[in-house]
């Protein structure tokens, strides 16, 4: 007889290994924890490794916050070879022997072009849709369509190491950034083409690689240890400011969903009732525009 699934609530930060899909990680973790409900917060390509937060239960309601959060990656780019997918899993479409002589100074001038506000064209091999069809499906059929560019922001772009035909970089960027596209664009700027050969996500929102678990680690844990690996919902917003409800505001918020304008509040705010986290609220110049209640931050609820 199938065991009753547990109503778990919180986030498990996974360190995804290479050659497994994000959805496979999700399904394995859901089975491992016998969880009723689970969802991930944006896919990592099978060849990519690193931070993949998985949400259980009520935490799935805030998955979008992690989708929208800034990310950090370590990426390795191979120069002189272009592929149709922009990474090592694609077919080679061009080769060049004209790789320039690389130096730290020269590469710095190239990387400087990609810091700050950047207009980027996503790769054809992506989950973005064109007339309802995922681009990767069209690409596999040999079809090419015009992909709309998007505005992204690269906050930090650091050269870690390089040799005659490759470079390793650290990238801190906004949502919607494709590191494969960045690799392609850097290769074009160098005049020799390039593609991504390794990618590790080292941070997603507040979650860092140092606090992530590999699936194999979790399989060896006791039930109590598995539960202890789940971080509470508030951890997603740990860098957000706190507003503590006044006694006279509680009925309006809880019973009527009303909240008086707060000119000093803007963006995402944690709402506290005494010392308890109860909600996440979105403010626009002091006006409440959205809210989500979390009546308890426990990891298991009946």
UniProtKB/Swiss-Prot annotation:
An MF annotation (GO) of this entry: tRNA pseudouridine(55) synthase activity
UniProt KW Cell membrane keyword: no
EC number per UniProt: 5.4.99.25
TM spans (from-to): none
Catalytic activity annotation: uridine(55) in tRNA = pseudouridine(55) in tRNA
One of the GO biological process terms: mRNA pseudouridine synthesis
Gene3D superfamilies linked: Pseudouridine synthase
Superkingdom to which the source organism belongs: Bacteria
Pfam name, any one: TruB_C_2
CDD domains: PseudoU_synth_EcTruB (cd02573)
Active site: 45 (nucleophile)
UniProt keyword terms in alphabetical order: Isomerase, tRNA processing
NCBIfam families: TruB
Function in brief: Responsible for synthesis of pseudouridine from uracil-55 in the psi GC loop of transfer RNAs.
Family: Belongs to the pseudouridine synthase TruB family. Type 1 subfamily.
Protein name in the entry: tRNA pseudouridine synthase B
UniProt organism field: Francisella tularensis subsp. tularensis (strain SCHU S4 / Schu 4)
Annotated gene: truB
């Amino acid at each position: 007889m199938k065991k009753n699934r547990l109503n778990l609530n919180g986030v498990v930060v996974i360190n995804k290994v290479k050659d497994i899909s994000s959805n496979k990680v999700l399904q394995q973790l859901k089975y491992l924890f016998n969880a009723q409900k689970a969802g991930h917060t944006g896919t990592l390509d099978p060849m990519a490794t690193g931070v993949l937060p998985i949400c259980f239960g009520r935490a799935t309601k805030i998955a979008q916050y992690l989708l929208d959060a800034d990310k950090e990656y370590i990426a390795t780019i191979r120069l002189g070879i272009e592929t149709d997918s922009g990474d090592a899993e694609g077919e080679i479409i061009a080769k060049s022997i004209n790789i320039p002589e690389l130096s730290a100074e020269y590469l710095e001038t190239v990387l400087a072009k990609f810091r700050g506000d950047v207009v980027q064209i996503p790769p054809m091999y992506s989950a973005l849709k064109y007339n309802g069809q995922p681009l990767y499906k069209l690409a596999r059929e040999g079809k090419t369509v015009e992909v709309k560019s998007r505005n992204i922001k690269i906050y930090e772009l650091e050269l870690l190491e390089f040799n005659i035909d490759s470079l390793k970089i650290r990238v801190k960027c906004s949502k919607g950034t494709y590191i494969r596209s960045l690799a392609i664009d850097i290769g074009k700027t160098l005049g020799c083409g390039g593609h991504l050969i390794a990618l590790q996500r080292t941070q997603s929102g507040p979650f860092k690689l140092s606090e992530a678990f590999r699936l194999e680690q979790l399989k060896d844990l006791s039930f109590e240890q598995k539960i202890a690996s789940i971080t509470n919902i508030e951890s997603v917003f740990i860098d957000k400011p706190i507003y503590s409800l006044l006694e006279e505001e509680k009925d309006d918020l809880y019973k009527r969903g009303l909240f008086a304008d707060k000119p000093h509040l803007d963006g995402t705010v944690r709402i506290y009732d005494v010392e308890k986290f109860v909600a996440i609220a979105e403010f626009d110049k002091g006006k409440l525009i959205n809210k989500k209640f979390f009546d308890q931050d426990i990891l298991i609820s009946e």
